[in-house]
Amino acid sequence: MSLADELLADLEEAAEEEEGGSYGEEEEEPAIEDVQEETQLDLSGDSVKTIAKLWDSKMFAEIMMKIEEYISKQAKASEVMGPVEAAPEYRVIVDANNLTVEIENELNIIHKFIRDKYSKRFPELESLVPNALDYIRTVKELGNSLDKCKNNENLQQILTNATIMVVSVTASTTQGQQLSEEELERLEEACDMALELNASKHRIYEYVESRMSFIAPNLSIIIGASTAAKIMGVAGGLTNLSKMPACNIMLLGAQRKTLSGFSSTSVLPHTGYIYHSDIVQSLPPDLRRKAARLVAAKCTLAARVDSFHESTEGKVGYELKDEIERKFDKWQEPPPVKQVKPLPAPLDGQRKKRGGRRYRKMKERLGLTEIRKQANRMSFGEIEEDAYQEDLGFSLGHLGKSGSGRVRQTQVNEATKARISKTLQRTLQKQSVVYGGKSTIRDRSSGTASSVAFTPLQGLEIVNPQAAEKKVAEANQKYFSSMAEFLKVKGEKSGLMST
């Protein structure tokens, strides 16, 4: 049998299973429809009692009667002997705590009934007053006349002034219809039932709170009477609660929610009654999980103390709660102020010397010479001699451009060259005439020349170096002197004047 045949056989078997499953579903469909029809609420009934049946139930009446009976007795702690679960009042406390959940569901049903009936008269009131109990009280106060919104003292005790103003303005423009007397009576009956159920719920809370301090005083001090009763009911009694570890107590009351495709950001997994208690919810959200673990650990200790009927006055509970609050305060303390530290002392390492005779000598020795500076310098807009790469090597730049072609010729700057006076120029001229010319390179006069001479005839003879100059000057005074005048010569024949 090939691989393709095996795959085809598997597909045929899967198809047969689907057909068989579909037949089974078709047979069970009527039963499912019957269940759904029973769970749906028919809010179109004439009276609220057709949908809200808790108020007239036997279980509700028995629990409330037992609560009133035990409140009047005022049992003492010395009467409880043995396990707490053996006390007859313990079962009443657990049943009363469960009854509060049913009352909440009943209030939601009655609120929906009143909302559907009163939308005929004032359809906008549902969006203006979202709270269920406030809506029920407002409907009972207004009734069929919406003019009661103005200057109504009873309504001011239910709603805020801003909400009353919005309700009165909306009531003046609403397009609702007047209710008949029968419809108004049914609404009043539903409102009265809802308010009485709410009062019964508060009565149960007061009773559970007073009795939890009697059955489990230390546990109720830490997490409150209502939360203590809830976790005791889920655990199956105080004895079972005392045997549970803290990690399991923290999860009591956790519900697995199926969101069917919705966002899971608001889901809090592994959270139970302790997480939603007042002592944990008073903290910021980022500390609540940590606080729930701490409170669960202390609740375990308190439950074990209560199960042995020790510390009936709640001394251990107060100590544990003080320890919890101290840790909560420690967690919420701001971080310590960071100390301002001074900068560390700098490391005095060997510094670079930027002055001194030795440094200047080194700079002169290793620095660029004037010739190199001239060779590196180029003129803007002028073509270089080796622009076409005819010669090998680097360009000479400005070096020797304005000279005679010698590489080392000094460049003369007319603005900065040395100047001498005219008197010094005449003196140098005279010396060049006497000594046959004198320059910076060549000088005919000896360095030992003097006006004193030694001769074999006269011995010591003083010679005037300027005597020869005077002879030349006297010879030149006749024709070339600046003091010479024009001479008037009279010719013998022509009679003309000549000079």
Swiss-Prot record:
Subunit info here reads: Identified in the spliceosome B complex. Component of the U4/U6-U5 tri-snRNP complex composed of the U4, U6 and U5 snRNAs and at least PRPF3, PRPF4, PRPF6, PRPF8, PRPF31, SNRNP200, TXNL4A, SNRNP40, DDX23, CD2BP2, PPIH, SNU13, EFTUD2, SART1 and USP39. Interacts with a complex formed by SNU13 and U4 snRNA, but not with SNU13 or U4 snRNA alone. The complex formed by SNU13 and PRPF31 also binds U4atac snRNA, a characteristic component of specific, less abundant spliceosomal complexes. Interacts with PRPF6/U5 snRNP-associated 102 kDa protein.
Cellular compartment(s): Nucleus; Nucleus speckle; Nucleus, Cajal body
Instruction: Name the linked condition.
Output: Retinitis pigmentosa 11: A retinal dystrophy belonging to the group of pigmentary retinopathies. Retinitis pigmentosa is characterized by retinal pigment deposits visible on fundus examination and primary loss of rod photoreceptor cells followed by secondary loss of cone photoreceptors. Patients typically have night vision blindness and loss of midperipheral visual field. As their condition progresses, they lose their far peripheral visual field and eventually central vision as well.
Q: Name one GO cellular component term.
A: nuclear speck
Region annotation Disordered: where it falls in the sequence:
1-37, 334-357
Q: Where is this site: Interaction with U4 snRNA and U4atac snRNA?
A: 270, 293, 298
Is the keyword Phosphoprotein in the record?
yes
Q: Which residues form the Glycyl lysine isopeptide (Lys-Gly) (interchain with G-Cter in SUMO2) crosslink?
A: 471, 478
Nop domain location is 215-333
What is the name attached to this protein's record?
A: U4/U6 small nuclear ribonucleoprotein Prp31
What result follows from mutating residue 270 to A/K?
Reduces binding to the complex formed by U4 snRNA and SNU13
Tell me which residues bear Phosphoserine: 379, 395, 432, 439, 450
Keyword annotations for this protein, in alphabetical order, are: Acetylation, Coiled coil, Disease variant, Isopeptide bond, mRNA processing, mRNA splicing, Nucleus, Phosphoprotein, Retinitis pigmentosa, Ribonucleoprotein, RNA-binding, Spliceosome, Ubl conjugation
Would you identify the family this protein belongs to, as annotated? Belongs to the PRP31 family.
Keyword Ligase applies: no
Extract the coiled-coil ranges from the record.
85-120, 181-215
| Any one Pfam family match given in the protein's UniProt record, by short name | Prp31_C
Q: Where is this site: Interaction with U4 snRNA?
A: 247
Q: In which tissues is it expressed?
A: Ubiquitously expressed.
GO MF: identical protein binding; protein-macromolecule adaptor activity; ribonucleoprotein complex binding; RNA binding; snRNP binding; U4 snRNA binding; U4atac snRNA binding
What are the Acidic residues biased-composition ranges? 7-37
The domain comment in this protein's record states: Interacts with the snRNP via the Nop domain. The coiled coil domain is formed by two non-contiguous helices.
